[in-house]
């Protein structure tokens, strides 16, 4: 039995959920999100509670049970509080700045890297060495943060690059003479 899947998802005040077939739509103060569950699970909405139940006892049904419940819980959290990823830039001359909706990164390349935020995700640069990615969709926020980080991943010798806030970078010792 799924320990995660058997917990119902409670809808806080100001959040509504509507179900049509296998598709659930959650609306809240920060927007609306939809999720289509597989045929292995059954979704029910009653009394401000969303319940996810497996159809059958197959391994796939149990896997989808916990995953579907987590997706619905993330949607509820996204439309109420939102999600946020913070990135730090380390390195001499490495910096970030916003120009309208575009993030401009100086990362030691011969050119500046321009990154435009997709719809539903906002990017801010409160300092030249900090980037904040926010949005209602957890997957989109994580994907945008990972794409920004991929432009200059932290290297193990000096630790230069873009890292998540609080991320530990394994450091290596240089060559010995």
UniProtKB/Swiss-Prot annotation:
Belongs to the universal ribosomal protein uL6 family. GO terms for molecular function: rRNA binding; structural constituent of ribosome. Signal peptide: none annotated. This protein binds to the 23S rRNA, and is important in its secondary structure. It is located near the subunit interface in the base of the L7/L12 stalk, and near the tRNA binding site of the peptidyltransferase center. The lineage of its organism: Bacteria, Pseudomonadati, Pseudomonadota, Alphaproteobacteria, Rhodobacterales. PANTHER family: 60S/50S RIBOSOMAL PROTEIN L6/L9 (PTHR11655), LARGE RIBOSOMAL SUBUNIT PROTEIN UL6M (PTHR11655:SF14). Keywords: Ribonucleoprotein, Ribosomal protein, RNA-binding, rRNA-binding. PROSITE patterns: RIBOSOMAL_L6_1. One of its GO terms (cellular component) is cytosolic large ribosomal subunit. The keyword RNA-binding applies. This is Large ribosomal subunit protein uL6. One of its GO terms (biological process) is cytoplasmic translation. It comes from Ruegeria sp. (strain TM1040) (Silicibacter sp.). InterPro entries: Ribosomal_uL6-like, Ribosomal_uL6-like_a/b-dom_sf, Ribosomal_uL6_a/b-dom, Ribosomal_uL6_bac-type, Ribosomal_uL6_CS. HAMAP family: Ribosomal_uL6_B (MF_01365_B). It comes from the Bacteria. Part of the 50S ribosomal subunit.
